[in-house]
């Protein structure tokens, strides 16, 4: 399971539409050192920022096939959530941003599916974000 998260994290680091990754297993995470002392591992929750804002987050979330749409994240299957259009929708944008909930933020709770299948599913969903022309192409 740990290697799955590492493979997905590495995939996100290389993808042009993923602007940032928040994962307690990253040394750059502000609570990385505390996590080493308190937990056996950083867990399966990976949060990433997809370029293109709310529409990009919705397209990604609605385009994956293996991930289950979830408001609450927990279980053995991979779950996906777009907070700006789901759990935090009723908050004003300023309040969401103050809490670190940006428009393109997506939460992914990695389950037990085959990692290659998850990567392929995320890739085809991110391709749909690109096809929606919500972000500028870079040369």
Positions of the model-derived regions?
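Conserved small-domain helix->loop->beta segment predominantly found in fold-type I
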Residues: 6-65, 71, 91-97, 134-139
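Electropositive phosphate-/nucleotide-binding environments in soluble metabolic enzymes
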Residues: 2, 6, 40, 54, ...
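PLP-dependent enzyme catalytic core of the Aspartate aminotransferase-like
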Residues: 73, 78-139
């Amino acid at each position: 399971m740990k290697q799955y998260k590492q493979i997905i994290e590495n995939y996100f680091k290389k993808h042009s539409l993923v602007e940032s990754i928040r994962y307690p297993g990253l040394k750059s995470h502000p609570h990385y050192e505390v996590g080493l002392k308190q937990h056996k591992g950083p867990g399966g929750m990976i949060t990433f920022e997809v370029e293109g804002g709310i529409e990009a987050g919705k397209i990604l979330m609605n385009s994956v096939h293996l991930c289950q749409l979830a408001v609450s994240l927990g279980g053995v299957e991979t779950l996906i959530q777009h907070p700006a259009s789901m759990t935090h929708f009723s908050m004003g944008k300023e309040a969401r941003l103050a809490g670190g909930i940006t428009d393109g933020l997506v939460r992914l709770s990695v389950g037990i599916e085959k990692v290659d299948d998850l990567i392929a599913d995320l890739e085809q969903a991110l391709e749909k974000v690109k096809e929606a022309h919500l972000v500028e192409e870079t040369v």
